[in-house]
Amino acid sequence: MGYQAFTVQDAIERVRTLGLIGNEPVTAEEIGDGNLNLVFRIQAGEKRLILKQALPYAKVVGESWPLSLERAWIEQSALKEFAKVAVPFVPHVYHASKEEAFTVMEDLSHLTIVRGGLLEGEKYPLLAEHIGSYLARTLFYTSDFAVGPVAKKQIARQYYNPDLCDITEKLIFTDPFYDAETNAIEAGLEAEVDRIWNDAELKREVAKLEALFITKGDALLHGDLHTGSIFASAEETKVIDPEFAFYGPFGFDVGQFIAHLFFAAYPDYDRLRDERIKDIDTFWLTFASTFKALWEREAVEPFRKADGLVDDVLSTILQDALGFAGCELIRRTIGLALVADLEQISDSTVRLERKRHALRLGAALIKRRTECKTFTDLRNFDVTEELSR
């Protein structure tokens, strides 16, 4: 059976054929609003399922941007890999088809997408702690430090994901820093964007970060970890959509999440700033303490007991993460796939002000990331000069 894009009826027939539902009455709907996939919610009695099928192109561009369907298999493999070490934070996978590029997984509709929930004023008191634990566990347990270099290389071969890595390389590390067709620059930001495009130091540092992304295979990454890829409630957190998964630098997922916590402050900056900074604080401290505990208990690194080594590893992760966060702040402000955190600010004057802030904060994090050896340095990180220029 070859690939074809599913209709709602196709989705129902697949889950029924697989024995995941019986012959009882079924309701189903297409709910996907992403750029790369079809997503169907299927309910039969008390059983609720999600069927996600990859498309062979990016919907935002069309068939002129073809994509390999292999990413669907990579995504389900990553979900299963992450579930081995962080099961409370990963949806259960019931079935996957490589040929038809679909995965059937648990329905999470009892939770809300974090980005939308935050915009509606929802509170997620455990989110930062949960994601800190999730990333510490998924990154540590898929790294050389936990499984050794031979086993890691064998695992990494399963996550060769060139199409989606190419998207990241272009949309995060290249296009926002040049006059690219994919950019979406709001009128009134031209002077700020010119400042970025003409900043030689900034471009040099972005090039270094891109080189890290391309060449440094520390651990299995989610690859696209933002608040739109997380379902949560006050008590529960689930991370979805790891179709960008590949072996890359520890700091990338960490930086992506930090960037989107910054974005989550912008809809009501004066009120939310301190709350989001506290979230970043909780996230990093949970990540660092969990990673360090796993290292001390389970690392197979020959020099694992060398004085200060794990602290040096965490310092490097933090610095890289801040640089990657800066790139994401700039990309999501003027590049492809803008964030609702900024776009839904109705007052155009305020919206432009917040976008300028995001661009300057991003540039400052990129250029000055090496000032932060520890999280105490980040707490004291002063970008007043950049933000006031």
UniProtKB/Swiss-Prot annotation:
Q: PANTHER family under this entry?
A: METHYLTHIORIBOSE KINASE
Which positions form S-S bridges?
A: none
Q: Where does ATP bind?
A: 37, 52, 106-108, 241-243
| Organism field | Exiguobacterium sibiricum (strain DSM 17290 / CCUG 55495 / CIP 109462 / JCM 13490 / 255-15)
User: Which pathway is recorded for this entry?
Assistant: Amino-acid biosynthesis; L-methionine biosynthesis via salvage pathway; S-methyl-5-thio-alpha-D-ribose 1-phosphate from S-methyl-5'-thioadenosine (hydrolase route): step 2/2
A single GO molecular-function term is:
S-methyl-5-thioribose kinase activity
Record's catalysed reaction(s): 5-(methylsulfanyl)-D-ribose + ATP = 5-(methylsulfanyl)-alpha-D-ribose 1-phosphate + ADP + H(+)
Name of the molecule in the record? Methylthioribose kinase
Describe its function. Catalyzes the phosphorylation of methylthioribose into methylthioribose-1-phosphate.
